[in-house]
Each structure stands twice: as C-alpha cells, then as structure tokens.
C-alpha cells in the first residue's frame, strides 16, 4: 500500500543535496535484468504511491550478487545502457552513469519535454498525470545536467521538476542560462516539499484523510 495509507504522516525525509553511496559496477556479478514482477519491489514502489501498472511498464527488475551474496532491485535504464538501481535499502548504478531519455511517442519527438532529477519523480509525474504528451529526461543525478543539453534542443517548452534544494536550484539555473524562457520551473507545484514524490505521497495522505473523515 502507499505509505500515505499506512501511517499518520508521510514517512519521507527531506534531504539536502547529499547523495547516497553507490556500489561500483565491478562489485556486481551475475547481473541480470528481467521484467518487474517481484512483489517486494512492486510493494516498495507502491509505498512511494506509484501504481503497479506504471511501475511495471516503465521499470525492470535486476538480480545480481555482491561478494557472493544475492540482491535484487528496481532497474531503470539510461541512454548508455547502464541501470539505475533502487530498493528500500539501496540506491546505486550498474554500468556507465548517464541520463535517461523517454520520448512520449514513437513517431517523433514532442514539442515539450519534462526534466526530472530521478526516476521516482518521473514515475510520480506519470501517476499525477501532469506530463501527458511530453518527452521526458531523467538526469539520474544533477551532475549529468550537461549531458541533457543536446537532448533539449528544439523543444518549445521544457518543464523542470527538479528538487527544491541547493543542487536542484543550481541545475535549474544552469539550464535556464542556456535555454532562457523555454525553461519553466515546474517545482512551484510542490514548492513546500523537497521533491515531486514527497508531494505525491503527501497528496495521497491528504485525500485519504479527507475521505476517512467524510465516512
């Protein structure tokens, strides 16, 4: 269940611009990617208020070993063939670190693009239904801002859903310096929260609270 349904307040911490340590690619052995089906991983994303059908459509499931011990995680591919890995206890990357680019349609690029810092925020936007028709770029780390620049050329509107912390604001400033008024700060939607997923979880909590009060 979404954590908004399970706890009196959303159990999400607001973290400043610090990034979790990641396993290096050489430490991962017997790496395999399969369709997302593991109940623990689907449940993890559902706790972040991401519906199972969206999670299974956009994500994969990775199995690997570290020092002989088996692990599994939600996997999200980047443009270099690397994989962002995430589960309830771990955040890491397999292969080259890079951005992810997801066109909305197969028959050509959209006129709009949405930019996210991490793939959980991208899944949150799909859940909220706020990027219909727009292509998407996931930075997978704000250090990848420059890698996103070539992909952003030609769009008439670029909606940025970056984190409301120092790193996120810096990334927005860098992109705005290049694309000017084409760049739209969409973080105003969740200005009281650190990121879009925290906003989604809180919105779900509020709706559930009001629903219970009206019963």
Residues of each region from the PLM?
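Phosphate-handling DNA/RNA-contact segment within nucleic-acid enzymes
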Residues: 64-151
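Short, small/acidic-rich helices and loops at N termini and domain boundaries
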Residues: 1-5, 57-64
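Short glycine-/small-residue-rich flexible loop motifs, especially phosphate/cofactor-binding loops
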Residues: 42, 122, 176
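TOPRIM fold recognition
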Residues: 111, 127-215
